[in-house]
Amino acid sequence: QIIDNTDGVPIGNYLSQYFANLMLAYFDHWIKEEKRVRYYFRYADDMVFLASTKEELHILLSDIKKYLAALKLTLKGNEQIFPIAENRADKHGRGLDFVGFVFYHNQTLMRKSIKQNFCRMAARLNKKLNISARDYKQKLCSWYGWAKVSNSKHLLKTIIKSQFYDTFVLRCKAV
């Protein structure tokens, strides 16, 4: 099925990443050098701006919309301005969900959907009686990568088969 559409950039196309960086390179410079935004992060077309007050962010959002309009680009319309919580228990804000993680001031967690997929795969593998340690490690190493850079040590110890845990962690560190 061919969809004739001229809006946006094709998702999943290798050129999409290149075009996103090409189109937004000057935007990055404008944000950092001219607008002097201290905390700005971008992955392809996902952007995060951090500031001391909501007012600063509302002004910045207005300026960004004007800048992008000059390039004939628009924001998706799902932008959000909110306080970031100290940790998961803090009810005076929320975590920042970005690139597969949920960031708080003092902790980083895996996104819930990634954690659920990790747990499901580990449970499926833990039920197999005749799985080799090598196959077990190969199936779970990518999720281990997510877990090791977040605050998920307890999760790892809980879901990985105890007989594989020590060698699993060593093997994944070597990969």
Language model: regions and residue ranges:
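Conserved polymerase palm-domain catalytic core
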Residues: 1-44, 48-65, 71, 78, ...
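Right-hand nucleic-acid polymerase module
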Residues: 4-6, 58-59, 77, 81-175
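Juxtamembrane helix-loop transition sites at the ends of transmembrane segments
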Residues: 66-67, 121
